[in-house]
Swiss-Prot record:
Membership in a protein family: Belongs to the NPR3 family.
Function: Mediates inactivation of the TORC1 complex in response to amino acid starvation. Required for meiotic nuclear division.
Region (Disordered) location: 31-97, 118-188, 219-293, 640-685
One Gene Ontology cellular component: GATOR1 complex
Biased composition (Basic and acidic residues): 230-245
Start-end of Polar residues biased regions: 260-284
Biased composition (Low complexity): 56-67, 82-93, 663-674
UniProt KW keywords: Meiosis, Signal
Signal peptide (UniProt feature, chain positions): 1-23
InterPro entries linked: HTH_NPRL3 (IPR056603), Npr3 (IPR005365)
Name the record gives this protein: Nitrogen permease regulator 3
Annotated coiled-coil segments of the chain: none
Species this protein is from: Aspergillus terreus (strain NIH 2624 / FGSC A1156)
Compositional bias of kind Basic residues: 43-55
Length: 818
């Protein structure tokens, strides 16, 4: 995996709607009409697939014996289809697609993925189940939990799979009329497979009720995530939960793999192809069986909304989980609600099917049909909106009815702590910072591999990503219960004030502020940042997008016409790092220059240069601790031996008053001790075990001749704790004043107070991950006071040349980065 954190990449190829009634499944709608065209697969996706490993299986070999023509007319038609397929392969390179499906019965959500395919007209269709957990790669999917030991609703796919090549049209004809004479229209095939195959493949039987599973189709590697919910006779969704033994599930999955592959792929397949044709499932529930009602054949019993994905192989699990958690589950839940309330999905499915039948009779073109569908069907329009918005990493605002409106998105990545390496794809303009990463102070169990995230703690501030007037206008126009509170908070919020400070000044409770700020961050209207301060240092970001400098310069000039231009500001910030306050010419310009800084941060032009430190342990400290530990060992040993000798003397005195036999026995025992022939007794060497803890502090691998760094003071080992105790013990109790005549000056308290008082407060930040700039905000201390203490401890600053520093207090090693 690349070291750079990638922005959201939904890898969305298509969305499919399938419903099933008592009469059988029905392929209702899909968007885009032809995912293989330039409109469906963006150039970026083509470039991404082109960089992956191409499949070694050609389209000719995969389709040569599929249809098996039995007449001259069939043979001529078969040859024509092969020529069309070869032309299609020449126009677009073989594709690599992976993804994750999920179908939902009464409200289904599925994600389908594809990989290494030419999308030929003759691809076999296969399904298999594996007993493993959720796979991390496409084509070998293994969430495999199945209870379906019989083929059930999928068993009849065999009838259509064998003749699939006879029903398919060339993908390039999707913009034309209703297809060849006597054949199905072009909108009844998708990704090289006819609608009949998709209908039965993506409409699982009732045994799959509320289960999430993935489907792989041949070397297309299409995966479908499904969470079917079956509808009861009363119109409600079933919620029965059933759990079986894990071994039974694994065995059933293996049976299903074979049965499904044979059912959907009647032709011969190689072993590698069979492995690619996989389906993995995760059971979530089962609905009770129902008897069919003759008068109820047209009632919908299930629907699936299937998402076809195209993630890179190494990002398969992450991308599929993102779209499942953020899009599919929420979209399916809204459809379930409307279907249960008003029969929305079934009504819209019938409406869409009616429009398609009329278009088929009239020979309407695909483009005209889809324009009509999107205009007349709210469900088709909703699927269109979800696809176009999510595929572009935007927010999808969907209105199913006057009462049900939802907004869907995959939360964007707003920052990265890494610069791209030589082999990494660069994302210029992404905010370069570690400020929103989890640190040991935020979470003591965190480590450097913890993924970055927005930490909306009380010491953060809010940076609006658009003008305040624009956001307020949108908030007021949207209405809703949160609108008044949001508008009030936005007016009170400033990027120079933390949430806690805003709460104190505005009277808004801190939890409310954090909730509102989180809402604005999630919906891409703001960003959580450390509060802007004139004593902080800001530099030009190494990840800024200089290709947009001309456009940004014009926008900057409109926003700040009387202030230095954008090139001049960037040039000034590119020099020797210094506090931002040194760029402000006067107090009257303070607000304007902070507005400039906020504008630069918003566009990723600058980033904060922050300081990080760790405690250094010198050889002198190590040797002093070593000597002290050995002295303690000797003292304990001598003390224990003295106690043993005293006990022996007491026993000798008391033996003189015993009878002769006892005296003889005691004398014999003492003689035995003197001769060294001691009788083994429990606990005789107990004193040695008492020294075990002390000896454990003496790490033989620790060099006493080199300095060491304490990586995590909050998780220090016993030996590291002794080192830090020795360091603190050497701090002077009465430090000399920095300058003559400043004794008792409150402004010099950080220079005149013993560091022993400050050490417990500051030590937790000396871990190399928490910026020292946090201390003043988190501990509610004056910045000047904090930097005085840090300077005494060894932080390299520009003002330390004027101070008389004590070498005994110089214990920090510091670095500076973003």
């Amino acid at each position: 995996m690349s070291s750079i954190a990638r922005p959201p990449d939904p890898c969305l190829v298509a969305i499919i709607l399938i419903v099933r009634s008592r009469a059988g499944p029905r392929f209702v709608f899909h968007y885009p009409p032809n995912p293989l065209s330039d409109n469906g697969l963006k150039s970026a996706k083509k470039a991404r697939r082109a960089s992956r490993t191409k499949s070694t299986r050609s389209s000719d070999s995969s389709s040569s014996d599929d249809s098996g023509p039995t007449s001259d007319e069939d043979e001529e038609e078969h040859q024509r289809l092969q020529q069309q397929q070869q032309q299609q392969q020449a126009q677009q390179q073989s594709s690599h697609i992976a993804g994750q499906p999920l179908s939902v019965t009464h409200l289904a959500g599925s994600a389908v993925s594809r990989r290494s395919s030419n999308f030929g007209l003759d691809d076999h269709v296969g399904m298999a189940a594996s007993p493993g957990g959720e796979s991390a790669r496409a084509g070998s999917i293994g969430s495999g939990r199945t209870l379906l030991r019989k083929r059930g609703g999928n068993s009849d796919v065999e009838d259509d799979a064998g003749t699939s090549s006879d029903r398919q049209d060339d993908a390039g004809s999707s913009a034309m009329g209703g297809g060849r004479k006597g054949g199905p229209p072009p909108w009844e095939s998708l990704l090289g497979l006819p609608a009949k195959v998709w209908e039965k493949l993506l409409s699982p039987s009732r045994a799959w009720h509320k289960r999430r599973f993935e489907v792989g189709i041949n070397d297309l590697g299409r995966k479908k995530k499904k969470k079917p919910r079956a509808e009861r006779q009363g119109g409600e969704l079933g919620h029965n939960e059933h759990t079986d033994d894990a071994r039974e599930e694994a065995d059933a999955g293996e049976e299903l793999m074979v049965a499904s592959t044979e059912t959907l792929s009647p032709h011969q397949m190689s072993a590698s192809e069979s492995q690619r044709a996989s389906i993995a499932s995760s059971k979530t529930g089962r609905a009770p069986s129902e008897s069919l009602d003759v008068d109820d054949k047209d009632r919908m019993t299930m629907f699936n909304v299937v998402f076809v994905l195209d993630p890179p192989l190494l990002e398969y699990s992450m991308r599929s989980r993102e779209i499942y958690d953020n899009i599919i589950k929420k979209f399916a839940k809204a459809l379930k609600w409307e279907q249960a309330r008003t029969g929305y999905v079934w009504r819209e499915a019938q409406h869409i099917s009616h429009i398609k039948e009329k278009a088929k009779e009239k020979g309407t073109s695909v483009n005209a049909l889809y324009t009509e569908l999107i205009n007349q069907s709210s469900l088709a329009r909703a699927i269109y909106t979800v696809y176009t918005s999510i595929a572009a990493s935007k927010i999808a605002s969907v209105s199913l009815s006057p009462d049900v409106s939802i907004s869907l998105q995959i939360p964007p990545l707003t920052s990265t702590p890494y610069l791209p390496g030589p082999t990494d794809e660069a994302y210029p303009g992404l905010w370069l910072t570690t400020a929103d990463s989890v640190t040991p102070v935020d979470d003591p169990t965190a480590n450097e591999s913890t993924a970055p995230h927005q930490v909306l703690a009380k010491h953060f501030a809010l940076l609006l990503l658009d003008s305040e007037a624009t956001i307020l206008k949108d908030v007021e126009a949207s209405g809703g219960a949160l609108a008044p509170a949001l508008a009030h908070y936005i007016r009170c919020s400033k990027p120079t004030k933390s949430f806690a400070q805003i709460s104190a000044s505005s009277g808004i409770p801190l939890p409310t502020i954090q909730m509102l700020a989180s809402h604005l961050v999630y919906w891409r209207r703001a960003r959580a940042i450390p509060p802007l301060h004139q004593r902080d240092t800001y530099i030009v970001s190494p990840n800024c997008d200089l290709s947009k400098l001309d456009v940004a310069t014009a926008a900057y000039q409109l926003a700040f016409p009387t202030l230095p231009s954008l090139p001049k500001m960037l040039s000034a910030l590119s020099g020797t790092p210094r506090p931002y306050g040194s760029f402000i010419p006067s107090k009257d310009h303070k607000d304007a220059y902070f507005a400039i800084l906020a504008w630069l941060l918003r566009g990723g032009w600058v980033t904060q240069l922050r300081s990080f430190s760790r405690v250094k342990v010198t050889p002198e400290i190590k040797m002093a601790v070593e000597v002290a530990l050995r002295r303690e060992e000797v003292d304990k040993y001598l003390s224990k031996r003295g106690n043993v000798s005293s006990d022996a003397g007491n026993r000798g005195d008391s033996s003189e008053h015993d009878d002769d036999d006892a005296s003889s026995s005691s004398s014999s025992s003492l003689a035995s001790q003197d001769s060294g022939e001691e009788t083994p007794m429990p606990g005789r060497y107990k004193q040695d075990s008492e020294l075990q803890l002390t000896r454990s502090l003496l790490d033989r691998n620790t060099s006493l001749k080199t300095s060491s760094l304490i990586l995590f003071p909050h998780r220090a080992s016993p030996l590291e704790s002794r080192w830090m105790d020795e360091i603190v013990s050497r701090f002077p109790d009465n430090p000399r004043p920095a300058r003559p005549g400043t004794e008792g000056d409150p402004e010099q308290a950080g220079l005149q107070t013993s560091l022993k008082q400050f050490w417990p407060t500051y030590i937790k930040y000396f871990n190399g991950y928490d910026a020292l700039e946090k201390i003043s905000v988190r501990e509610n201390l004056k910045r000047k006071h904090v930097w005085q203490v840090l300077t005494r401890l060894g932080l390299v600053t520009g003002s330390q040349a004027s101070l008389d520093l004590d070498p005994r207090e110089q214990v920090l090693v510091s670095v500076r980065h973003w």
